[in-house]
Amino acid sequence: MDVPSSSSSRFSVGSASPSSVLLYAKDLKKWDEFEDLLEERRHISDFKFAMKCYTPPLYRGITPCKPGDIKSIVLSSEEINYVIKQLSRESLTGVDVLREEASEILEEMSHKLRIGAIRFFAFVLSKIFKQIFSKVCVNEEGIQKLQRAVQEHPVVLLPSHRSYIDFLMLSFILYSYDLPVPVIAAGMDFLGMRVVSELLRMSGAFFMRRTFGGNKLYWAVFSEYVKTMLRCGYAPVEFFLEGTRSRAAKTLTPKFGLLNIVMEPFFKREVFDTYFVPISISYDKILEESLYAYEILGVPKPKESTTGLLKARRILSENFGSIHVYFGDPVSLRSLAAGRLNRNTYNLVPRCIPQKQPEDVQAFVTEVAYKMQLLQIENLALSPWLLVVTILLQNQLSMDFDALVEKTLWLKGVTQVFGGFLLWPDNKLPEEVVQSSILLHSNLASLVKDQVVLKMNSGSSQVVNGLVPEHIALLMCSAYRNQLLNIFARPSLVALALHMTPGLRKEDVFSCFSFLRNVFSDEFIFLPGNTLRDFEEGCYLLCKAEAMQMAGKDIILTDKGTAVLQFLTSLFKPFVESYQLLCRYLLHEEDYFGEKEYLVAARKFTRQLLDQGSSQCYDALSSELQKNALAAFVRLGVVEKKKVDSKYVYYVNGPATSKLEEMLGCKKPIGKPATAKL
């Protein structure tokens, strides 16, 4: 068993306002004990495991059917027939032609779930996981709750997404516990992997195009296919809210398409309820860490192919530490909607007629998506390496070993006070914990003569697209640091606001916090419309860490809080500086541009500053950060987005760009938000 440690540090609550304490004073969470799935696998034949008696519990309202039956149900559904007739009238295309096209679409996307393929993957994955992972740890209580949930109502699994193996890992875990293997929404990229794509189909994967390009028939067939599986209770439906893997290891803002689809049967009263299960998958060491660094530096992602998969066999000789998979409590969609949503509008027209979602429903779907992601973040397990690398990145990339251990222990205490789920082995000395973390990540750090140094060659001397290995190594390290930012976001933004605000009046600090939260709302997960509560949570956590106190309408900083506030400000410094740097790029380089041109030119501009030594902000090289900044610039009016000849073009608003750059640099005061109420 692997049990997360309880906090050894004790911080008093300080003097946060009673409302803040009421809202955010959470009981110390009693984390479930984790079971290592691989422990039993190491003592029992993999073949015996794969061929075990597999009798998963079934949904009580299940409609028994085979994969082929689902396709027949979809093609004969009232909704598909209605859409085909509508399109036939609009395009003057024969109904039979459109029906054949719908059948081809179904053939392209549909799964062919078979127990034989599941057993094959169970055998192969058991061997691979034992080879590359020390442990695969799962919270048993979460599994027990899921076991009950799949029998009561349709279930939607919502895992975090950090690696290609996320969905394989989940299917392996569910098979191990005799739970129904899910049907999984996968990208069309995998279809290039011939034999592998067929195996994935037979293990439950169904394939969707990245964009539907306004293809009404494709959208109708795809959505009806997913809804049919959900209504029939065929199997749990699994997809990633983020839509794609996060290359920078921060949770990406949610995509709403699939979520809309799986919620619709409830909206139309076709099912009584639907359970959402947020799942948090945490890796000690990410398999694709170097690949991600190259991708966010502009190197194209390798095309998925069987040949590429075979070349990836080299990872079988590496150690990737442990994986922790936390199954959150099933969340009832009916409970979320109670008193929040009026479903009567769906009764006014026949179910088969597609409807445009009312604004209140759109807002509700958005709220549910962000809430599920916040639950994922809450249950992500944090390894000691995240603390170690964060300290090193703030200390000139090298430190005395004893000083590093001391600072890591300090950060451990702060992390636990902020509610981080930290996996720190209590049966080891701190020095051993830090040393074993460095050893696991020996491609990024080394211990030489009592000095810990981050390696700046990342095991490669290759220069790609003019990028030097140092940038690759730094971005690999940043990806681990970024995992801490999920739980540090709110107190860090308050700390930044305190640093940027002249005087410490609560109202002024809140205004600055609101501005920063708006600027960085594409970088981190914030529930829309929750600004005041986020501010109160950040203040409460800083009071809890004894970094500050509330005194009426003022904030008082404590002597003990200097280290905490300096650390938090430094933690977010790369994002503030990157956005400033990108503002300068817009002012000096471009009047208008397309997104692809922007990414290439912004990276070139940043690289020149790094080469000249006039900036050390290597985070600005990241395409993920550049895309997030562009989305923020559009929202803030720094650039205007227009569609020209079916392509989007961005026009720079010079004065607004200058103003934002000055506000981030504390050269211009931040105005009060119109809706600020404290």
UniProtKB/Swiss-Prot annotation:
Motif HXXXXD motif per UniProt: ranges: 161-166
Domain of life: Eukaryota
Keywords in alphabetical order: Acetylation, Acyltransferase, Membrane, Peroxisome, Phosphoprotein, Transferase
Modified residues (Phosphoserine): S12, S17
Primary enzyme class: transferase
Function of the protein: Dihydroxyacetonephosphate acyltransferase catalyzing the first step in the biosynthesis of plasmalogens, a subset of phospholipids that differ from other glycerolipids by having an alkyl chain attached through a vinyl ether linkage at the sn-1 position of the glycerol backbone, and which unique physical properties have an impact on various aspects of cell signaling and membrane biology.
Domain remark from Swiss-Prot or TrEMBL: The HXXXXD motif is essential for acyltransferase activity and may constitute the binding site for the phosphate moiety of the glycerol-3-phosphate.
Protein name stated in the entry: Dihydroxyacetone phosphate acyltransferase
Protein's organism: Mus musculus (Mouse)
Gene: Gnpat
